[in-house]
Swiss-Prot record:
Role summary: Redox regulated molecular chaperone. Protects both thermally unfolding and oxidatively damaged proteins from irreversible aggregation. Plays an important role in the bacterial defense system toward oxidative stress.
Name of protein: 33 kDa chaperonin
Cellular localisation: Cytoplasm
GO MF annotation list: protein folding chaperone; unfolded protein binding
Keywords: Chaperone, Cytoplasm, Disulfide bond, Redox-active center, Zinc
Keyword Glycosyltransferase carried by entry: no
Any one GO BP annotation for this protein: protein refolding
Domain of life of the native organism: Bacteria
Organism name: Pseudomonas syringae pv. tomato (strain ATCC BAA-871 / DC3000)
Classification via CDD domains: Hsp33
InterPro entries linked: Heat_shock_Hsp33 (IPR000397), Heat_shock_Hsp33_C (IPR016154), Heat_shock_Hsp33_N (IPR016153), Hsp33_helix_hairpin_bin_dom_sf (IPR023212)
UniProt keyword Protease present: no
Amino acid sequence: MHDFPDIDFTQRFIFDESDVRGELVALERSYAEVLAKHPYPEPVAQLLGELMAAAALLVGTLKFDGLLILQARSSGAVPLLMVECSSERELRGIARYDEALITPGAGLQDLMPDGSLALTVDPRQGKRYQGIVALDGVDLSESLSNYFVMSEQLGTRFWLKADGHRARGLLLQQLPAAQITDPEERDASWEHVVTLASTLTAEEMLSLDNQTVLHRLYHEDPVRLFDVQPICFRCSCSRERSANALASLGLEDAQQLVIEHNGSIEIDCQFCNERYLFDATDVAQLFAGGGVDSPSDTRH
C-alpha cells in the first residue's frame, strides 16, 4: 500500500495515555530533485535520503525560526554529507564521495568510518548553536539517537530509511511527565513504544502510509494523528548571493579572475548546480555600488 498525500510532508502524532510524541516524514519529490542534481551511487543516495528525513523530523521538533544544518564528515569513501532544512520546511542536500571506494550494499560504517555528525541551528535572531557526536552507530538512526542521549534530558529515538526513490523517518520523543508521573511506569511506557517501533521493517516503512504504520505498531494504544505539514526542495542560492561572494574578494582580485577566466567568472552552486556568470561589466557595476543586474546568463 502506498497511499501518501501528493506532497512531501511531516506528520505529528501523540499518545493519549503516555507522555510520548511522535513525528513521521515522507519524502519523494524533494528527494528526487536532490538526486536529479547529482547522480549518486545507491549507497550514497540512501545515506543522503536518511539524513534528509532526519533534518525534516528535527525541524518539526526544534522550535526555532531559521536554518537547521546536519553535516556528517569522515575520512572514508564519503567525506561529506550535508542537509539544510529551513523552519519553512525547505530542504536541500549534497554528498561528496570517492566512487572508487563505493561498494554495493555498503552501510554507514563502511562509507564513513571514524565519522562525526554536527547539528547546527542557525536562527535568524539569536545565537547559532552546534552540537557534535561521533558517527558510532550501525546506521544514521542509531548515531542520531545517540546524539540526543548525550544532549537531551528527554528520551529521543530515530528510525530512518531510504532506497533511492523514497526517504522515510520516524521519531519518538518523551514529553515532560504529565500523564504518567511514576518514574518506573514512565520508563516502562517509553520502552513499550520504542520496542514496538523497532519491529517496523524497512519495507513497511518505505511502502505503508502513516495511518497503516501507526495501526500496525500501536493498534492497542490510543494515538492521535495530526494534519500533515508540507516539505519541498528549494535551494537558497541566488545571483545576489553569488555577487556578494564575489564582492568579498575585492575589486582587484575580482578583475584579475575575470581576466584569468577569459572574460567571465562562473560561480556554481554545489547544491543545485545552478551557474551564475559575471563579466567585466558586472564586476565594475558591482563595485560601483549598483549591484548586478539579473541577465539571462544564469544557467542550469
